[in-house]
């Protein structure tokens, strides 16, 4: 079964007019057991400040079709490389942690609605260049709309 890393924006997308349809279709695939939703402890922390409906949606993920992963020192080191090599600025470090987490845990696709710092062809090239030079595999990064 495919494993998709969901960054925090995907959970909020379920309640955003622009992103709702594609996001809910993606969560339906999780519910039906077609996709494993991988999320990190960073996502959990970021969701603490989310609206109640987003938190409830996150907590209702089917446990059998979701996988919680931990941010490690290896992940933080890789995320730091993305910043020091100017793929994005320091203020986007948490986005880099999501990218590095998905890379280290070898998910099939990282899914995000963050078009500025994550789902951006130039940024993706930068992340993957660093991944390959650091002996990791390249990472497929897509919006929910692109994978339905």
Segments the model singles out, each with a brief description of its role:
Residues 1-39, 46-60, 66, 84, ...:
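Short, well-structured N-terminal submotif of metal-dependent ribonuclease cores
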Residues 1-3, 9, 17-20, 44, ...:
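Acidic, PIN/NYN-like endoribonuclease modules and their adjacent C-terminal/linker elements
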Residues 30, 61-62, 102, 134:
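A generic structural signal for well-ordered alpha-helical segments
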Residues 38, 69, 140-142:
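General small-molecule cofactor/ligand-binding pocket signal
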Residues 41, 72, 145:
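Residues at the C-termini of beta-strands that transition into short coil/loop
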Residues 44-46, 95:
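Acidic-residue sensor for enzyme active/binding pockets
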Residues 64-65, 137:
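Short, structured coil segments at secondary-structure junctions
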Residues 68-126, 148:
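Active-site neighborhoods of divalent-metal-dependent phosphate/nucleic-acid chemistry enzymes
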